[in-house]
Amino acid sequence: MIGYPIGISDQYNHKPVIRRGITATHPKKDYQGQKHILLDMACFPGSSGSPVFIMNQGSYATPSGITVGNRIYLLGILFGGPQYTAQGILSFANVPNIPKPIVNIPTNLGVAIKSSEILEFEKILDPTHEQ
């Protein structure tokens, strides 16, 4: 995945951050019945819109066996991910109620829309697109 997690980049060279992970669900199956893929990688705010690639160096598996060579394939575009909340307790002297802040904690999972769906946005973004 290539992007700017929580605004981080290589400012000196003007380059985004490249991270790696694995698919948490099979890329050819629709996650939760939608054209989505679940990813097991560090996905933080600022990563939405990042392209997610499959990159194989040296060899990769195909239905007919092992292919020697390199491959890069646009898998999808990250748009979100599950988070859970942790409630902490802050204590203040002489206060009858104890505030309980809710903190979102990333699960290091992300959800991407499949690359096959990218052109569907044309129907939404281009009012002159024939339907």
What are these regions (language model features)?
Residues 1, 23, 48-52, 114:
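Terminal peptide-recognition signature
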Residues 11-15, 66-67:
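Short consensus segments that form the blades of beta-propeller domains
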Residues 41-77, 88-93:
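Catalytic nucleophile loop of clan PA
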